Structure formats: structure tokens, C-alpha cells
């Protein structure tokens, strides 16, 4: 009888741990949807195009052209490492995201824009995407996360990121 109660307790504890993990990971699953983007981080979506823009940050430079259509955003350009990130020999990972923002400054959709693969030796990459655009999108914003690494016995690593919120 006592063994059964212990097992029931372990079962309940397991369910609680799993529930907590699901809640904790929900931020990664949902991304930044609903979060407020500062006005300085918003790029108003001009109609038509192509329009040329540059987004300079501490660690990357995103140079891009976009054409804004009613239900789609065509965007292409180049991602280049900058600042401290460009001093490392290779990229462990680099992910750049595009965020559609509504008229209230809230993120309504997140789209992956570009990803560099593990051990990529590049410093500049090109991308081209056709992205379904939400009807309520009035501006866009960008964010990234990455890790670069040196070669040799030290193999120093440098993590870098920026979000629009």
C-alpha cells in the first residue's frame, strides 16, 4: 500500500515538473508576440517599392531592399558581422528575425529572416525571402542572436543578441 502512495506521489510530481517546463518554455514557443516595440526600433512599412534600408547594430549590419505588397513582403539583402563579432574566425550560429508590428506598436508576427549554419566561416551572407504579411502590419522590426568562436586551443566564444523590445 505504501509503495503505491509513493508511486502516486512521484506521478503527481512528474506531472507538475512537466507542466512547469511547458510554461517555462512557452516564451520561446510564442516568441515576442504581443510585446511592445519601442518606436525607435520600428521601421514603417512604405507601400510599393523597392525601398532600401540599413539596420546598424553593435554586432551586425543588415542592408536590405523590400517591396511591400498588400499581403506579402518581399525582402532581400545582406547580413554582415560588425563590432566584436567580426573579430572571431567562425560563426557557431546566427539567427536574424523579422517582426511585424501593428499600429499600436505590438508584435503581431515573427518570421525567421536568416540563419547561418554551425562552423560557417563567412562574415557576410545574402538572403531573399517572400513573407506572408499580416493585414494589420504597419511597421517591422528586427532582432538577432548569435555565437562566434575563435580557433585554436582557447576557442573563445562570444554570444551576442538584440531584440526590438
Residue ranges of model-derived segments:
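Surface-exposed edge beta-strand/loop patches
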Residues: 36-46, 132-134, 138-165
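Bacterial Sec signal peptide processing site at the extreme N-terminus
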Residues: 22-42
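Conserved aromatic beta-strand anchor motif in extracellular beta-sandwich/beta-rich domains
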Residues: 96-102
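Short, solvent-exposed, Trp/other aromatic-anchored flexible loops in extracytoplasmic proteins
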Residues: 106-152
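Short amphipathic, basic-aromatic surface patches that mediate peripheral association
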Residues: 78-88
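Low-complexity, acidic Ser/Thr/Pro/Gly-rich terminal tails and inter-domain linkers that flank the onset
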Residues: 39-70, 78-80
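Short coil-to-beta strand junction motifs in C2/discoidin
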Residues: 89-96
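Sec-dependent bacterial lipoprotein signal peptides
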Residues: 1-25
Amino acid at each position: 500500500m505504501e509503495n503505491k502512495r509513493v508511486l502516486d506521489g512521484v506521478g503527481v510530481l512528474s506531472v507538475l515538473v512537466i507542466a512547469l517546463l511547458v510554461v517555462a518554455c512557452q516564451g520561446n514557443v510564442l516568441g515576442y508576440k504581443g510585446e511592445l516595440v519601442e518606436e525607435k526600433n520600428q521601421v514603417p512599412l512604405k507601400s510599393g517599392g523597392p525601398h532600401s534600408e540599413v539596420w546598424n547594430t553593435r554586432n551586425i549590419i543588415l542592408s536590405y531592399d523590400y517591396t511591400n505588397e498588400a499581403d506579402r513582403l518581399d525582402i532581400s539583402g545582406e547580413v554582415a558581422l560588425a563590432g566584436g563579432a567580426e573579430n572571431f574566425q567562425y560563426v557557431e550560429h546566427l539567427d536574424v528575425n523579422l517582426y511585424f508590428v501593428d499600429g499600436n506598436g505590438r508584435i503581431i508576427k515573427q518570421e525567421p529572416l536568416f540563419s547561418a549554419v554551425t562552423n560557417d566561416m563567412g562574415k557576410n551572407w545574402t538572403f531573399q525571402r517572400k513573407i506572408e504579411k499580416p493585414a494589420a502590419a504597419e511597421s517591422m522590426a528586427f532582432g538577432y542572436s548569435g555565437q562566434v568562436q575563435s580557433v585554436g586551443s582557447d576557442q573563445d566564444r562570444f554570444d551576442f543578441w538584440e531584440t526590438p523590445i
